[in-house]
């Protein structure tokens, strides 16, 4: 199976959960709710899961082989880094009286 699309939703919260991803395979099947988490040794993925019992979670979908897991991790983390760079490169100009006046004049 080939990964044909990766979509990332960056989360602007200050904790370990950095993003949620969806991965499409062969333009035919998609896995939603893959979590991108910041660990002590860098980013890693948590596959979608549901709670079973009091403190246990069970994956809803997950790769069966190490090469498949690595392929998904590489695709998702690369897309995360790409989207993070896009978001970080958006520069905002500090608000000053001068640029507020300019904006007001442009809107007239």
UniProtKB/Swiss-Prot annotation:
The keyword Lipoprotein does not apply. Residues 94-108 have a biased composition (Acidic residues). Keywords: Cell cycle, Cell division, Septation. InterPro entries: SpoVG, SpoVG_sf. It comes from the Bacteria. GO terms for biological process: division septum assembly; sporulation resulting in formation of a cellular spore. Belongs to the SpoVG family. NCBIfam families: PRK13259.1 (NF009749). Could be involved in septation. This is Putative septation protein SpoVG. It comes from Finegoldia magna (strain ATCC 29328 / DSM 20472 / WAL 2508) (Peptostreptococcus magnus). The lineage of its organism: Bacteria, Bacillati, Bacillota, Tissierellia, Tissierellales. The gene is spoVG.
């Amino acid at each position: 199976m080939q990964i044909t699309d990766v979509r990332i939703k960056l989360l602007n919260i200050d904790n370990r959960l950095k993003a949620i991803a969806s991965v499409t395979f062969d333009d035919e099947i998609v896995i939603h709710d893959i979590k991108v988490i910041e660990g002590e040794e860098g980013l890693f993925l948590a596959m979608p899961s549901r709670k079973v019992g009091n403190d246990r979670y069970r994956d809803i979908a997950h790769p069966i082989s190490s090469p498949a897991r690595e392929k998904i991790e590489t695709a998702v983390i690369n897309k995360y880094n790409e989207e993070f760079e896009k978001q970080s490169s958006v520069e905002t100009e500090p608000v000053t009286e001068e640029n507020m006046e300019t904006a007001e004049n442009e809107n007239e």
